[in-house]
Amino acid sequence: MLLSPKFSLSTIHVRLTAKGLLRNLRLPSGFRKSTVIFHTVEKGRQKSPRSLCIQTQTSPDVLSSEKALELAQYKSKCTKQSGIILQLKQLLSLGNTKFEALTVVAQHLLSEREEALKQNKTLSQELVNLRGELVTVSTTCEKLEKARNELQIAYEGFVQKLNQQHQTDLTELENRLKEFYTGECEKLQNIYIEEAEKYKTQLQEQFDNLNATHETSKLKIEASHSEKIELLKKAYENSLSEIKKSHEMEKKSLEDLLYEKQESLEKQISDLKSENDTLNEKLKSEEQKRISREKANLKNPQIMYLEQELESLKAVLEIKNEKLHQQDVKLMKMEKLVDSNTALVDRLKRFQQENEELKARMDKHMAISRQLSTEQAVLQESLEKESKVNKRLSMENEELLWKLHNGNLCSPKRSPTSPAAPFQSPRNSGSFPSPSISHPDDLPGNQRQTEGISAGLTLPATAHHPP
């Protein structure tokens, strides 16, 4: 079955080439070798009858052994070929699946190509339509540009004509306004001069009143300040004199105490000296007695020993007495120092209290003086401010007078006291057809000047009066 022509490698090769899938097959590495083996086996099979015919003449044992070997070889070859055939079947199934996938991909690509062709056709048609529209739009744009140029030329000519007319109207208005404003300026100059003189007199009176009130308040403050300073000085001198008196009294009392203590100490010293003299005399008498006893008791050694012990005990007692005396002296000194220290501490506390009281008084006096100085500074600042305001007002009045004398004040605005008839008459007359039209160089400047003058003239009415 394995060596039949249906399953031979040559037939499989022919079928694959016929289908056109030989390129897609990827056989394993041992495929060509197996084909070569198959070809050699077939050739061996073709040649085997001849060899068998020759070998029939040999012994039957050799033939049986060779047949067994050949059978074993054929069996191994058959197993190998069956494995190769299975691999080829698997490769065929894989090739078929790949081919089906390729067909699906090709169909998909063809469908996409058809859609792309359809879109290309539609886009080409749209392009043709857009080109036609572009041509029409370009023609309309050219027409519109021509119309715009024509309109611009006509507009420029019209604007030039309007400018010429406007300039002529402006010149006429300037001449009329100049004629009108010259007469009005003369009237306003006279009115402003009269008002300026009135305000000047009023300001001078206010300034004189302010100076008088300032001088009187200054004198009053200086007098009160000097009186307060004198009172503070007197109080300070009185407190100092009282402190000095108390200090002298305490000093005298302390000196008296010292003198009394010195006298008591001197008495104690004299008493101690007399006691010391009596004790010395007693010691001398006792020594004489001791000497006499020693002379009498030279023969008794026990008595001598006892007398020596007595003398040593007396010496020890004397040393202890001296130490006790020194300690008493030290105690006396310590008591004196403690008493003096307590007295000094009391004096120190008293002086500290007095010093604190004096400091509190001085702080109060300093606070009062500072308050007075601040009040004086505030008054001086207010005076300076009032003087500056008065100077500014006087300068503004002088400037206004100078401007009025030089004739720079020419405006259609009326003053607070001027009548409204001169301003309404030219507007109602036929010589001024358009009251809202004004020259940009003449009217705003004059209006600003008149506004500044009216503001300067109304300042004195709202001037700051002193409190």
From Swiss-Prot:
| Predominant cellular place of this UniProt entry's protein | mitochondrion
The entry's localization annotation reads: Mitochondrion; Golgi apparatus; Cell membrane; Nucleus
Keyword Flavoprotein annotated: no
What keywords would UniProt list here? Cell cycle, Cell membrane, Coiled coil, Golgi apparatus, Membrane, Mitochondrion, Nucleus, Phosphoprotein
What the entry lists under InterPro entries is as follows: MTUS1/CCDC69 (IPR051293)
One GO CC term, this protein: plasma membrane
Which portions of the chain have biased composition (kind: Polar residues)? 425-437
One example of the protein's molecular function in GO is: microtubule binding
Q: Does the keyword Membrane apply?
A: yes
Assembly behavior: Homodimer. Interacts with AGTR2. Interacts with PTPN6.
Q: What does this protein do?
A: Cooperates with AGTR2 to inhibit ERK2 activation and cell proliferation. May be required for AGTR2 cell surface expression. Together with PTPN6, induces UBE2V2 expression upon angiotensin-II stimulation.
Similarity comment: family membership: Belongs to the MTUS1 family.
Query: What name is this protein filed under?
Result: Microtubule-associated tumor suppressor 1 homolog
Which species is the source of this protein?
Answer: Bos taurus (Bovine)
